[in-house]
Amino acid sequence: MEIREFADMDKFEDIMNNWAKATGLATVAVGADGKYISGCYNFTDFCIKLTRGSKEGCRRCEKYDREGKGVYHCHAGLIDFGIDLVVEGQKVGSVIGGQVLPEQPDEEKFRKLARELGINEDKYIEALKKVNVRTEEAIDASAMLLGQVLNNFINAEYSKKINCSIIGSLTDGVNAANHLVEEIKKKTGELRGIQSKQKILALNAS
């Protein structure tokens, strides 16, 4: 089951975009296979261009993307989140994001990380200074809210599709039944015609 098969993705994207603007947090949705199914909102250069732009940084990021649940600290020291999207007990994807600092950063710590990842230190620190700072409580509340809203939305969309399918099946069934009734009426009329002819023949024979 894929979200794009039953949900209005324009409305889905609107929810994510508005949430990202309101909170200052980054977010993206992925399908059950881990591939992006939405745009990337509020993604930082620190994460996308630099950390993920390095081979080792990308490897570490992808590991946390797969394994991270709830709100957690990523390998680069930022706070991220991963919330499952579930329809009728089946996981159909996740919404992941965050990319914010829980406090003012220790510059030397990030210079060390830049060296580990093979990233230019000065560019890394320059990008780091543009990363938003949020308390863990605010990040947790924001992430849970987005998860609840998106889960409510996709479940409503799924129910709507199922209901439309049921109505469509019922309509087809009613149409088929009406057609059958018309056929029966037609055959009944033909039988009556034959019976009338037989009566006339019988009377003539007598």
Task: List PLM regions with ranges.
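Signal-transmission coiled-coil "S-helix"-like helices
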Residues: 122, 126, 133-171, 175
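Sensory/regulatory domains in signal-transduction proteins
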Residues: 59-115, 130, 134-141, 145, ...
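Amphipathic helical oligomerization segments
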Residues: 182-206
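Short regulatory/linker helices and ligand/cofactor-binding micro-motifs at input modules
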Residues: 1-6, 129-131, 174
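Residues at a fixed heptad register within alpha-helical coiled-coils and interdomain linker helices
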Residues: 168, 175, 179-182, 189
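Active-site gating loops and adjacent loop-to-helix segments of metal-dependent hydrolytic enzymes
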Residues: 115-121
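Structured interaction and signal-relay segments at domain junctions
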Residues: 1-77
